[in-house]
């Protein structure tokens, strides 16, 4: 679900950027200067990548999406354990050893008669 939303956001931004470039209004020199100063605040490796690739490549987009989809899978196991602990807490008991039968003495077990 998270990766689908990320993909939709990246797709929407890339389409807006593509159509925005075609419909862009002429700007004054002052506006252009402030845009460049905003770019100088970015880290150098990101700037290098931005200037090296003028267009968005499909391979780069797929790499970013695959890296983003790896993150939620790593956290799914602890979440499952937390839910298990929650439901066990609702039941009021928890076995420290799984599937260990308790010693049951038949004399202490109530009987409702003999089934025929």
Curated annotation (Swiss-Prot):
Organism superkingdom: Eukaryota
One GO term describing the cellular component: extracellular region
InterPro entries tied to this protein: Neurokinin-B/TAC3, Tachy_Neuro_lke_CS
Propeptide: 21-79, 95-116
Subcellular location field: Secreted
Region (Disordered): 92-116
Main location: secreted
GO biological process: one example: tachykinin receptor signaling pathway
Modified residues (Methionine amide): 91
Keyword Secreted: yes
Keyword Signal: yes
Keywords: Amidation, Cleavage on pair of basic residues, Neuropeptide, Secreted, Signal
Signal peptide: 1-20
Described purpose of this protein according to its UniProt entry: Tachykinins are active peptides which excite neurons, evoke behavioral responses, are potent vasodilators and secretagogues, and contract (directly or indirectly) many smooth muscles. Is a critical central regulator of gonadal function.
Protein family membership: Belongs to the tachykinin family.
Entry protein name: Tachykinin-3
Organism encoding this protein: Rattus norvegicus (Rat)
Lineage: Eukaryota, Metazoa, Chordata, Craniata, Vertebrata
């Amino acid at each position: 679900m998270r990766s689908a939303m990320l993909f939709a956001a990246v797709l929407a931004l890339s389409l807006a950027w593509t159509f925005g470039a075609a419909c862009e209004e002429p700007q004054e020199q002052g506006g252009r200067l402030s845009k460049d100063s905003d770019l100088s605040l970015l880290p150098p490796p990101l700037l290098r990548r931005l200037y090296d690739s003028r267009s968005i490549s499909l391979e780069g987009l797929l790499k970013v999406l695959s890296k983003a989809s790896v993150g939620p899978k790593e956290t799914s196991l602890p979440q499952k354990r937390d839910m298990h602990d929650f439901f066990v807490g609702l039941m009021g008991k928890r076995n420290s050893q799984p599937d260990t039968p308790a010693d049951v003495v038949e004399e202490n077990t109530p009987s409702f008669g003999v089934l025929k």
